Amino acid sequence: MTKRIALLTAAAFSALALAATVSVPASAESGKMMKSSGDTVMVGGAPMYPSKTIVENAAKSKDHTTLVAAVKAAGLVKTLDGKGPFTVFAPTNMAFDKLPAGTVETLIKPENKAQLTKILTYHVVPGKLEAADLTDGKKLKTVEGETLTVKRMGDQVTLIDAKGGSSTVTIPNVNQSNGVIHVIDTVLMPS
């Protein structure tokens, strides 16, 4: 009996220690995150290390395989691996799945590289903007050249694109060595 209690106590402390090192959403609806020491955040089942670049971290996320494939197809790896700083609004695989059937397959074809590049660079803003910098009504000029509009209600940040579509930040402030990623739930579209 004493061994069983000792074993259960040890297991409980191990679980608490593990929980203290992993970031998990405090609320999927609010987008709030609990951060661990060092600001390492879990995204797509992988730790996002602040010492790594945007590309290095995104490549480890199971939730961003479509985005990484698109960045490669557009020839943007070297740019997003560069010094920056950049703020990247990173759509998940599920965000890409919301697009009409065949859209991603069409965009990653070599003959559509210019359109793909336009869409991807519309998700990038020069400089490092934390969630606290994304104030209601703020206009963000993207690398693509058009703007995104921030809508904010409490801690929830939503971006409005050039076509009037909206995308919610689900995981904010994923710090990188060359900027910050904010995970979003819908692909943003330029005009």
Model-derived features with residue positions:
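C-terminal segment of classical bacterial N-terminal signal peptides
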Residues: L16-P25
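Bacterial N-terminal signal peptides that target proteins for export
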Residues: M1-F13
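Mature, structured domains of secreted/extracytosolic soluble proteins
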Residues: T2-I5, S27-S191
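Short N-terminal signal/transit or membrane-insertion segments
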Residues: S14-A15, E29
